[in-house]
């Protein structure tokens, strides 16, 4: 019977512990999603510089 309070306290501590971070991190602790967003923005910027405004049809098709 002495173990029951200890067991209940342990269950409460486990339930209140912070969860594992769902965002994968790089070795420099930066979320990979921000790196992905940055790369996507850079590619979009280069795409716009290459296409627009000389070939408007190219930009319209590329934006989907």
Curated annotation (Swiss-Prot):
Q: What is the recorded post-translational modification?
A: Contains 2 disulfide bonds that can be either 'C1-C3, C2-C4' or 'C1-C4, C2-C3', since these disulfide connectivities have been observed for conotoxins with cysteine framework V (for examples, see AC P0DQQ7 and AC P81755).
Q: Which Pfam families match?
A: Chi-conotoxin (PF16981)
- In the UniProt record, the signal sequence range is 1-22
Provide the positions where the record notes the PTM Isoleucine amide: 61
Residues forming the propeptide are 23-48
Q: In which tissues is it expressed?
A: Expressed by the venom duct.
Q: Name one GO cellular component term.
A: extracellular region
Q: Where in the cell is it found?
A: Secreted
A GO molecular function annotation here is: toxin activity
Q: Which UniProt keywords apply?
A: Amidation, Cleavage on pair of basic residues, Disulfide bond, Secreted, Signal, Toxin
Q: What is known of its domains?
A: The cysteine framework is V (CC-CC).
Q: Which family does it belong to?
A: Belongs to the conotoxin T superfamily.
Full protein name: Conotoxin Ca5.3
What organism does the record attribute this protein to? Conus caracteristicus
């Amino acid at each position: 019977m002495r173990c029951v309070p200890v067991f209940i306290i342990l269950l409460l501590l486990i339930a209140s512990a912070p969860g594992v971070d769902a965002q994968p991190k790089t070795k420099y602790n930066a979320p990979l999603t921000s790196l992905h967003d940055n790369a996507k923005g850079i590619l979009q910027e280069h795409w716009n510089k290459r296409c627009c405004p000389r070939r408007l049809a190219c930009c319209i098709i590329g934006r989907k």
